[in-house]
Amino acid sequence: MKLKGRGIVKGVAEGELVVSRKPLSFLGGVDPNTGIITDPESDIQGEKITGKILAFPRGKGSTVGSYVIYALAKKGTGPKAIIVEEAEAIVAVGAIIAGIPLVTGIDISKLKSGMKVRVDGERGEVEIIAQGDL
C-alpha cells in the first residue's frame, strides 16, 4: 500500500518503522549520542531510532531541536527518514540541514512500529512493504 503526502526533503530510504502517536521534542527528548528517545512523556521512550524510519504527528519544543536532528545525522545515530502528519519548522529545518528524507501529510494512524516501509522524499510517498514485526 502506498500513502501519498508531500515531500519536503528529497531522498529514498527503506527500513523498519518506529511510530509515536505523540508530538516529539528533539531537544531533551532524543539523545544525539545514542539515538535513543529519552522523553519520559513519549510513548516510544527507550526506543532507538538509529537507522530506522521515524514517524510522529509533529515536532514540539525549542527551535534548537533542528540542531539535534542535525547532530543525530552527523553522529550516525539518526533515523534514515522521517514521516510526519505536519512538518512544522523545527522538524523541516532539521531534516533539511541533516539531509534526512522527510515526507509530510501522512496519516500516521495507518502506520505501526515494526512495519517495513520505503520513503520517497521526492515523490512524497510512503510505501508499506511488510506488515508487522520484522
From Swiss-Prot:
UniProt pathway annotation: Isoprenoid biosynthesis; isopentenyl diphosphate biosynthesis via mevalonate pathway
GO molecular function, one term: hydro-lyase activity
Keyword presence, Lyase: yes
Active site, per annotation: 62 (proton acceptor)
EC number: 4.2.1.182
Upper classification of the organism: Archaea, Methanobacteriati, Methanobacteriota, Thermococci, Thermococcales
Function noted in UniProt: Component of a hydro-lyase that catalyzes the dehydration of mevalonate 5-phosphate (MVA5P) to form trans-anhydromevalonate 5-phosphate (tAHMP). Involved in the archaeal mevalonate (MVA) pathway, which provides fundamental precursors for isoprenoid biosynthesis, such as isopentenyl diphosphate (IPP) and dimethylallyl diphosphate (DMAPP).
Biological process terms in GO annotation: isopentenyl diphosphate biosynthetic process, mevalonate pathway
Top enzyme category: lyase
Keywords per UniProt: Isoprene biosynthesis, Lyase
Pfam families reported in the protein's UniProt record: AcnX_swivel_put
Reactions listed under catalytic activity: (R)-5-phosphomevalonate = (2E)-3-methyl-5-phosphooxypent-2-enoate + H2O
Protein family (similarity comment): Belongs to the AcnX type II small subunit family.
Assembly and oligomerization: Heterodimer composed of a large subunit (PMDh-L) and a small subunit (PMDh-S).
Protein name: Phosphomevalonate dehydratase small subunit
Highest taxon, organism lineage: Archaea
Entry-linked Gene3D superfamilies: Phosphohistidine domain (3.50.30.10)
